[in-house]
């Protein structure tokens, strides 16, 4: 039986608890991601998807419940402690790399897990450079010829593709993708999604992707979760979501939740 990489048990998240503005953002979430699962999580604004991802990442303290990664209880661990198990790609392409360092320096730093001491003491070795060239060439963007370019001079799509490589260089137990194509134009977004899918499949990674794009949620990954008001409304495996269209998904959501999805950010993303 395939191991559970992520286990969430009875997870509740409150904001401003005990005040007139109390928001019960997550309501007893139970969720497991098994090794090799690539789950896309969608839902309207306020559904709880970003709160869920931030709770897993450690950037939001858990109100109640438990989070385990690769069998380790990380419920009360900091973001820094969890970084040994998790890699995260943010929405902003500028957030995952050091703009004044070159492409190869950023990749080298990622390989050394952000250890500046190891980075400055050894620099970029020839064998590392050869690996970087090979990995960059596999992206099909010509970036293998830009190793010495400052990463801050690259386009958002190029930078996000490199950030994906950096995030997966050391085979994280869990890859978190936080609307990582939302800031890109449609054509670049499609390219980065294809690269994402390729990396996740070839590296046999376990990944959780937050997205507003229903087409991407249907096209990519082997599992789809739709959230509503802090709960999981729909949970489909690869076979169940195969052949579904956006209208099918919207109809399913209405049947499960009793209401139609009205968030334009989701409805217009296809």
Predicted region positions:
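ABC ATPase NBD coupling module
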Residues: 19, 23, 73-87, 95, ...
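Conserved ABC transporter NBD signature motif
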Residues: 65-73, 236
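ABC ATPase C-loop
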Residues: 167-168
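A short, flexible loop at the N-terminus of ABC-type nucleotide-binding domains that lies
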Residues: 2-5, 14-28, 78
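The feature captures the beta-strand-to-loop junction immediately N-terminal to the Walker
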Residues: 42-44
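ABC ATPase nucleotide-binding domains
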Residues: 242-270
């Amino acid at each position: 039986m395939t191991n559970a990489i992520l286990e969430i048990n009875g997870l509740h998240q409150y904001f401003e608890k005990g005040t007139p503005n109390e928001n019960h953002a997550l309501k007893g979430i139970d969720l497991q991601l098994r090794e090799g699962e690539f789950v896309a999580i969608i839902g309207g604004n306020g559904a709880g998807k970003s709160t869920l991802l931030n709770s897993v990442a450690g950037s939001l303290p858990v109100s109640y419940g438990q989070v385990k990664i690769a069998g380790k209880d990380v419920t009360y661990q900091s973001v820094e402690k969890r970084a040994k198990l998790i890699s995260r790609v943010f929405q902003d392409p500028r957030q995952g790399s050091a703009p004044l360092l070159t492409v190869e320096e950023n990749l080298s730093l990622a390989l050394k897990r952000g250890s500046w001491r190891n980075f400055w003491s050894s620099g970029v070795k020839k064998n590392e450079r050869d690996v970087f060239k090979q990995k960059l060439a596999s992206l099909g963007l010509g970036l293998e010829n830009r190793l010495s370019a400052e990463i801050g001079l690259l386009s958002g799509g190029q930078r996000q593709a490199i950030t994906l490589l950096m995030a997966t260089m050391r085979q994280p137990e869990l890859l978190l993708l936080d609307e990582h194509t939302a800031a890109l134009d449609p054509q670049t977004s499609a390219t980065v999604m294809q690269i994402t899918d390729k990396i996740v499949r070839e590296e046999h990674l376990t990944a959780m992707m937050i997205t507003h794009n229903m087409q991407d949620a249907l096209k990519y990954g082997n599992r789809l979760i739709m959230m509503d008001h802090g709960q999981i409304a729909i949970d489909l495996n690869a076979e169940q979501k195969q052949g579904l269209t956006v209208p099918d998904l919207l109809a399913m959501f209405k049947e499960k939740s009793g209401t139609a999805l009205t968030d334009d950010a989701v409805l217009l993303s296809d």
